[in-house]
Amino acid sequence: MTDIQPDEPLLHQGGSARLRVHARGDEQEVDLDRDAPFGWWPAIAIALVAFIDRVEINLIAGALPVIQDHFGFSDTVGGLIPTAASIAAAVLLLPAGRLADRAPRVGTIVIVVLVWSLCSVLSGLATTFLMFFMVRIAIGAAGQLYNPPASSLLADYYPNRSRGKAYGFERAGYYMGLPAGVIIGGAVAEALDWRAVFFIAAVPGLFIAALMLTVKEPVRGLGDTIDRLRAQRTGVAPPESEAHVDLSVSSASLWADAKELLRIRTLRGVILAQAMLALGVAGLFYWLPTFLERLEDLDTDTASGLAGGVGGTGIVIGIIIGSRLGDRHESEGWRIRLSTVCLLVGAIGLSLAVLLPGVGLRMAMVALACAGFAGAMPNLTAAAANVVPAASRGMGFALLQFLTTLGGAFGPLLVGAMSDVTGWIGYGMLFLIPPLFLSVVLLWLVRGSYDADAARASASSSH
């Protein structure tokens, strides 16, 4: 495990300080005036990892009608594929969080990306539906394992001032991968064959794994150290708290660590809200091309292209606006309040996308929904990082991703099952809406605890 900074570095004149930045390296001069003292490459590299993860997971959504025709399975079984994969991922997430707090994070991420590429090739080689189903479970299980080490690494490279933008890069890659996977899956399946979809997608994974090796392992707690040094310059030190939660890395059980983290009220709210959000988003992106194909009489290629292109545009807009607004203001509970508004916009947009007839109206509302969801995500991720002490961020993000993954697991299955029961896929899409409004309520209830929880986390990181 990489140690947290053992001694508080001294400030130099001119707004710089010497401190150890990398796990294997000497001290170096750090400019405290820069928003991102170590540049944006670590965030970009992790964004590429998040992108290829979601591309490989969502290829099946774009090619789903063709794959259904080949293997002959129902909508319920189609929805069960991502559900089973997500449950498998959830089982591994808490151990992955423990690993992220103890093992080199860069190396862990590289191995995970290589496993994705291998599973993508195996998907294309499957000769029976059972083989295909099992490989998709494997890639789903591996798909979420990059998140705890990647999120922990970003929190160390980027102090609070730039943390929202850093997570914005990662969330942008993640959410752009959703429509990109849908578009690629639909286009390649229509032009070539559904097997070619998975063979082609394996190649970028190898390239991104090599790029990730250029990122050096940072010292744990580095971002928090920079925040404390900046506070010293202004004469306003981060407040200490008597209500200290001991979350240092120990030999405690996974469940004991998780229970300790869930004492943080803001984290509980963020986790539950993201779980409800994930249910809606997972169901939306998985079934949207099929929804458009059946209700608007579009072909597979056109439906996938519209779903991915319009959704991707909304995501880009939401990420840019959300991350900039989140980092710009520091008023009480700002990130949580901003996220609440963004999720409300997204929930309303998705409701109208399902209810309003016509391709143009539906796609305009899909863009609005995606912009709202994407605007919330970097701020929720940054808020989670800010309320969890540095030594336990890997476990904290694993817990967040664990429950979020479980929430998202049932979105595609819910839509598919309701489609089979009612005979109309629109009813299944309507069932995604109540959880989204519930996520808005959950965030609103914890908005007042964010600043106190962030202060306690900062105090814990300094011990």
Q: How would you name each of these model-derived features?
A:
Residues E170, Y174-R220:
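Helix-loop-helix hairpin linking two adjacent transmembrane segments in secondary transporters
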Residues G107-V121, I336-S351:
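Structural signature of the two symmetry-related core transmembrane helices
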Residues A196-L213, Y427-L445:
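Symmetry-related core transmembrane helices of the 12-TM Major Facilitator Superfamily/SLC fold
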Residues V91-T127:
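Conserved MFS/SLC helix-loop-helix module at the cytosolic interface between two early adjacent transmembrane helices
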